Amino acid sequence: MSTPTHNLPRTRVSAFCWVALERSTRIERPTSWSWKELSHYSLIVFHCIPDTTPKQIEECFKKFLRRPDIVIILINQVYADMIRPTVDAHNLAVPTVLEIPSKQHPYDSSRDSILKRAQRVITPPERHY
């Protein structure tokens, strides 16, 4: 197995481009990739192996947030919970961060950052008379 070329050794990155999604084709480079190779993708999904630390997940997540060519980040809710303050602090529309359920953990809508924001928009503020 070759050594990953990125500096987050325990994060496996799967990159999807819209054209590939339309054709139901998945482009994956689990062992070797570079930022240059991913430069033409607009949707990034990253999966973490079980012993990935929250710090490593957060570093990778922040790198994706800083990239101007990424518009959507999909993250399993269990990993978003590991870096919840960072996920909740991200309030820009682009890149949009979508939390998705994993096969091993149930989805909890009360912890989803997008649903929390939507609830704040829909719910009128309390009035004090």
Swiss-Prot record:
GO terms for molecular function: proton-transporting ATPase activity, rotational mechanism. The keyword Disulfide bond does not apply. The keyword Ion transport applies. It comes from the Eukaryota. One of its GO terms (biological process) is proton transmembrane transport. Keywords: Hydrogen ion transport, Ion transport, Transport. It holds the Pfam family ATP-synt_F. GO terms for cellular component: membrane; proton-transporting V-type ATPase complex; proton-transporting V-type ATPase, V1 domain. SUPFAM superfamilies: AtpF-like. V-ATPase is a heteromultimeric enzyme made up of two complexes: the ATP-hydrolytic V1 complex and the proton translocation V0 complex. The V1 complex consists of three catalytic AB heterodimers that form a heterohexamer, three peripheral stalks each consisting of EG heterodimers, one central rotor including subunits D and F, and the regulatory subunits C and H. The proton translocation complex V0 consists of the proton transport subunit a, a ring of proteolipid subunits c9c'', rotary subunit d, subunits e and f, and the accessory subunits VhaAC45 and ATP6AP2. PANTHER family: V-TYPE PROTON ATPASE SUBUNIT F, VACUOLAR ATP SYNTHASE SUBUNIT F. Belongs to the V-ATPase F subunit family. Subunit of the V1 complex of vacuolar(H+)-ATPase (V-ATPase), a multisubunit enzyme composed of a peripheral complex (V1) that hydrolyzes ATP and a membrane integral complex (V0) that translocates protons. V-ATPase is responsible for acidifying and maintaining the pH of intracellular compartments and in some cell types, is targeted to the plasma membrane, where it is responsible for acidifying the extracellular environment. NCBIfam families: V_ATP_synt_F (TIGR01101). This is V-type proton ATPase subunit F 2. The gene is Vha14-2.
